[in-house]
Swiss-Prot record:
Its main location: cytoplasm. Disruption phenotype: Deletion is lethal. Depletion results in cells that are elongated and grow into smooth filaments. Essential cell division protein that must bind to FtsZ for division to occur. Critical coordinator of envelope constriction through its interaction with FtsZ. Promotes the formation of highly curved FtsZ filaments, reduces the GTPase activity of FtsZ and stabilizes FtsZ polymers. May regulate FtsZ function by modulating its superstructure. Does not bind to glutathione. InterPro entries: Glutathione-S-Trfase_C-like, Glutathione-S-Trfase_C_sf, Glutathione_S-Trfase, Glutathione_S-Trfase_N, GST_C, Thioredoxin-like_sf. Residues 90-223 form the GST C-terminal domain. This is FtsZ-localized protein A. The gene is fzlA. Belongs to the GST superfamily. The keyword rRNA processing does not apply. The lineage of its organism: Bacteria, Pseudomonadati, Pseudomonadota, Alphaproteobacteria, Caulobacterales. It comes from Caulobacter vibrioides (strain NA1000 / CB15N). It comes from the Bacteria. Residues 3-85 form the GST N-terminal domain. The keyword Cytoplasm applies. One of its GO terms (cellular component) is cytoplasm. GO terms for biological process: cell division.
Length: 228
């Protein structure tokens, strides 16, 4: 019997986007339930007490399996749906992919999203006032450092973790895609990173990401352009 999947997510959440990309790449159908997580709806917090997306609910034989938090969901998908593998085919690549997942979900999130997305998105959603220019500047400086790191990896690799595309690429692209939604990625100064991102952006699993829109938050003009 097939598994029915429902993903509770917020379209402009990098963590949610990672899961959507993984499900799409493995061609696993799922129903989307968009959640305004900042309002702490009880039907959502009953699934995940932390109140944060994404949450994946799998239904099989009329029984629900609720999986919370990005890494747990990604590891579950990889364990239960093994093709195509998204953590590498050898231990070294799997270890490197996991290291980079942690890099983007912790270091990039703290140093870049914690400033740019907080100022440009969270403040708007929570009606916290105008963006702080000093915080935006700090986030943009950190973003350039991370883009430089991506380029250093790509000097000797086809993809971030090695020879094959992996969840590390999806993690990086998920974070960058939300920053790019607001037009803050200086692609012209990082051509190797831009070429890598264009390859990901052209994959079928990325199409729903490029179609994302949120009322009152319009994307940059080039956001859904495959040849930007």
């Amino acid at each position: 019997m097939s598994v029915e999947r429902t993903l509770h997510h917020f379209p402009l959440d990098p963590a949610s986007r990672q899961v959507r990309l993984a499900l799409g790449e493995k061609r696993l159908p799922f129903v989307e339930m968009q959640v305004r997580y900042w309002e702490m709806p009880p039907e959502f917090t009953s699934l995940n007490p932390s109140g944060m997306p994404p949450v994946l609910v799998e239904t099989k034989h009329q029984r629900n399996l609720v999986i919370c938090e990005t890494r747990a969901i990604l590891e579950h998908i990889e364990e239960t749906e093994t093709e195509p593998p998204l953590l590498g085919r050898d231990p070294a690549e799997r270890a490197e992919a996991r290291r980079l997942l942690q890099w983007f979900d912790r270091k990039f999130d703290n140093e870049v999203n914690g400033f740019l997305l907080h100022e440009k998105m969270e403040k708007r959603l929570l009606r916290m006032g105008a963006p702080d220019l000093a915080a935006l500047r700090q986030g943009r400086e950190a973003l350039r450092m991370h883009l430089g790191y991506i380029e250093s990896l790509l000097q000797t690799r086809d993809w971030l973790a090695g020879r094959r595309m992996s969840l590390a690429d999806f993690a990086a692209a998920a974070h960058l895609s939300v920053i790019d939604y607001f037009g803050d990625v200086p692609w012209k100064d990082f051509q190797a990173a831009k070429t890598w991102y264009m390859k990901l952006k052209s994959r079928p699993c990325f199409r729903p990401i490029l179609a994302d829109r949120w009322p009152g938050l319009a994307p940059a003009a080039h956001y859904d352009d495959l040849d930007f």
